[in-house]
UniProtKB/Swiss-Prot annotation:
Disulfide bonds join 62-129. Its main location: membrane. This is T cell receptor alpha variable 6. InterPro entries: Ig-like_dom (IPR007110), Ig-like_dom_sf (IPR036179), Ig-like_fold (IPR013783), Ig_V-set (IPR013106), TCR_variable_domain (IPR051006). Glycans are attached at residue 63. It comes from the Eukaryota. It comes from Homo sapiens. Pfam families: V-set. GO terms for biological process: adaptive immune response; response to bacterium. One of its GO terms (cellular component) is T cell receptor complex.
Amino acid sequence: MAFWLRSLGLHFRPHLGRRMESFLGGVLLILWLQVDWVKSQKIEQNSEALNIQEGKTATLTCNYTNYSPAYLQWYRQDPGRGPVFLLLIRENEKEKRKERLKVTFDTTLKQSLFHITASQPADSATYLCALD
């Protein structure tokens, strides 16, 4: 059985219909733009959709430029829901694991890899990386 994972830098769902979510989405967009402008930071994640065979390892890539972050975080976002924190890795750590998840952080390559081993259809979601 094959399924897909999405990896995006920023994902908004304006059709949710709740005023509070629209308001918060606008505030988050403004804050994100301010942080991006101040740090002149560019984050790139690999392909928008990734098709994975069940049981195989899924690997998502997050590349960044211009500065060295103190840490990098990965989040999972299911449709119609907010992002959920998964893992945080610090600049002095090369690798971090949690159950079937593994994150590597290479400050020389300015890259983080996010691996999901023994992939399952329930892993289908949007995955996001964030720097600080």
